[in-house]
Amino acid sequence: MPQQTAVVVLAAGAGTRMRSKTPKVLHSLAGRSMLAHALHAANEIDPTHLITVVGHDREQVGAAVAAVAGELGREIVPALQEQQLGTGHAVQCALRALPADFAGDLLVTSADVPLLDGHTLGALLDEHRSYQERSAVTVLTFVPDDPNGYGRIVRDADGQVVEIVEHADATPEQAAITEVNSGVYAFDATVLRAMIGRLSTANAQHELYLTDVLRLAREAGHPVHGARLLDAAKVTGVNDRVQLSIATRTMNRYILERHMRAGVTIIDPASTWVDAGVRIGRDAVLRPGVQLLGSTVIGEDAEIGPDSTLTDVRVGDGAKVVRTHGEGATIGPNASVGPFAYLRPGTILGEAGKLGAFVETKNADIGAHSKVPHLTYVGDATIGEHSNIGASSVFVNYDGVKKHHTVVGSHVRTGSDTMFVAPVTVGDGAYTAAGTVLRRNVPPGALAVSGGPQKNIENWVQRHRPGTAAATAAAQALAADEKSSQATEQKDGEQ
């Protein structure tokens, strides 16, 4: 029977240094809250039990835990820490949420360490289980640029971990140690249960330190171990907005490197941002200034950018998207979008379709090979295949109270400046003349022309706008025309 594993994510702290109405662990980077990153990482090692300790802002944090549980399709048990009496007390609360007979390994991590990934947790668990057949306690350690504030890892002459001394309790000699505690641990659950009840608040913080379990286990003759992590960034905590900004940039670097190693070309990583939940196909190209956010999916051989932001957008294989802002849209294979297009939620562009310069769409289903080349708004509409919408056309979908739908068939050609006053239907193969205002349905194959013959009211400007620059220009032009006409008549008379 496989050995059981539990993961405890500590998320009960107040996080006052963030100076925010939002709980610290719910601040986001790369499209997920710090808490969500921690839970996703824990889930990657497929634990038997996943527990989150909540305290401050328990309603908000608890709701976030439930949301992540839904995303992952698994149970995440919240454990309430009524009073924040230290990390040892938090784990005591978590143990109550575990089955009484659980005797596997228990990992402890924190929700404010968002860069810690499942691979690192898995490696820690493997080392914990292999050290002297099975360690009682394994602590993940690292060497930061500035160890101030971290608990120091005290080792003996043989390099074995003796204890962890919190910064506030460290002697000058101990404070000089550069190897520190990451706050990430692996425990033998049976040993942990035996030792955690012996914790004391006799320290500078008057709290129950989880770190003391390591010392107590060693004194009881159990093997303890320190596993050093070379990439310190992965276990760097986030306590304020400056650290959040640093962590955000570091996580983006990790994400971009992962995609590049998987076959994605990223021209300028310094100007490219990709959320953790984004998927990108092989041989796709991201040009400078690209942001891929939310659950965006980019197909193989697609080209995105420059200067494009896509949120929850699906882009098909081979599509090209240039200087575009898109939200909740679907772009078909080999389609072309941009520059300066705005795709709003509900937009579907079919295979090899085109949305060109200064086109805005919303709740629009545009068929394969159809084109909306430029300067057009398409809202609440269905357009068939192989149709072309002329420049400066508007789908007039709102009557001031509710919105209405327009249907344009396949192989339709509309002239520039066509107004589709919904609800209206244009049949397959129909045409519209430039400047047409469609208020009635157009039969298949018909040419729609609206308005009467053009009427010119001569000298209107001079009569109604006398003294203006327009009136002066008109008078001069008319005089020049009259002079030219007289000269022509004189020349004809001489002949």
From Swiss-Prot:
It catalyses: alpha-D-glucosamine 1-phosphate + acetyl-CoA = N-acetyl-alpha-D-glucosamine 1-phosphate + CoA + H(+); N-acetyl-alpha-D-glucosamine 1-phosphate + UTP + H(+) = UDP-N-acetyl-alpha-D-glucosamine + diphosphate. Acetyl-CoA binds at residues 391, 397-398, 416, 434. Keywords: Acyltransferase, Cell shape, Cell wall biogenesis/degradation, Cytoplasm, Magnesium, Metal-binding, Multifunctional enzyme, Nucleotidyltransferase, Peptidoglycan synthesis, Repeat, Transferase. Residues 467-495 are annotated as: Disordered. In the N-terminal section; belongs to the N-acetylglucosamine-1-phosphate uridyltransferase family. In the C-terminal section; belongs to the transferase hexapeptide repeat family. Homotrimer. This is Bifunctional protein GlmU. It comes from Nocardia farcinica (strain IFM 10152). The lineage of its organism: Bacteria, Bacillati, Actinomycetota, Actinomycetes, Mycobacteriales.
